[in-house]
Amino acid sequence: MALLSLSSCYNGNSNGNATSANPSFDEVITSRRSVRKYDASKKISEAEVRDLIKAVQDAPSWANQQPTKYYVAISPEKLAAVQDMVGGNKERIKDAPVLIVSTYERGKSGFFQGEQSNEVGDGWGAYDNGLSNCYLVLKARAMGFDTLIMGMRDADKLRELFSIPENETVMAVISLGYRAEEPNRPERKNLDEIVKFF
């Protein structure tokens, strides 16, 4: 995986979140939310983002291809530019101190010696990207941060802004920051609606 770092910022670790210093995995899962309002007074350092992405490198991928790449907006100029590329989410993430563009390199996962391994093809790249992003949002929560994965984004403008190669698919923009309020927990489906035992 690659980390594109654009600038450094505040190094503080104080977050005021409800998570403990060493939350259990269950605590991380149950406290993670898609956060749509961030605390503008709290910043995240480049070093903290690097620690986050380093942990994400342990995510599984097809034949260890590691197709996911990250482009990190952390400078005021790049943050403002990306905010204009996320459609209706602009107002929701205007106070997030970090915005991360997630991509995957096509022709890696789902391929062997350049040939598509099964009918899913490059869908495996998207699958592996989702696994990496799952690691990202869970590790972020373990670090006391909050996230929002946004599928609404202008891929062409993001590609130009970050000089993203043409062989990478722009999947999502992920905001990273501290929640300004406690979000509600959406209702989940009944377990029997999503699993069958045989």
In which residue ranges do the predicted regions lie?
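Acidic, surface-exposed loops and disordered segments
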Residues: 4-198
